[in-house]
């Protein structure tokens, strides 16, 4: 899942499964801020910055909010949720991308910037107008 850099957003994770049988969905856990740990772009794990518990949705799936501090670093964002006394660990991977990249992919008026400046390591010159040939510099 892609996340927009430096943007507060709700994420989903799960299913939370019972630690004893590994099958039964845990639907009534109180997953606190300290139970949810993040690693930003390969950094050390630390509890998520956004306060608040996770909320159960259905079938062991939970949601929580990440704030702008949680999503301020581009790259892979790993989420680990674990309560050793109650559930098996959950691991989720998110990809934090710059705002312009996210908007180009998912905004209602999404348009990729396709301006070409180099081809085969050659700088493109010329304006592309009628009768103008593009030349490698």
Task: Spell out what each predicted region is.
Residues 1-137:
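Polar, enzyme-active/binding microenvironments
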């Amino acid at each position: 899942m892609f996340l927009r850099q430096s943007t507060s957003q709700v994420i989903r994770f799960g299913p939370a499964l019972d630690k004893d049988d590994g099958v039964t969905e845990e639907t009534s856990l109180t997953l606190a801020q300290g139970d949810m740990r993040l690693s930003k772009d390969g950094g050390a794990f630390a509890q998520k910055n956004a306060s608040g518990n996770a909320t159960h949705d259905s079938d062991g799936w939970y949601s929580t909010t990440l704030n702008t501090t949680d999503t301020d670093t581009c790259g892979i964002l790993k989420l680990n949720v674990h309560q050793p006394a109650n559930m098996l660990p959950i691991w989720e991977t998110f990809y934090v991308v710059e705002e312009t990249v996210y908007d180009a992919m998912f905004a209602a008026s999404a348009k990729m910037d396709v301006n070409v400046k180099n081809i085969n390591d050659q700088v493109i010159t010329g304006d592309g107008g009628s009768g103008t040939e593009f030349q490698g510099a």
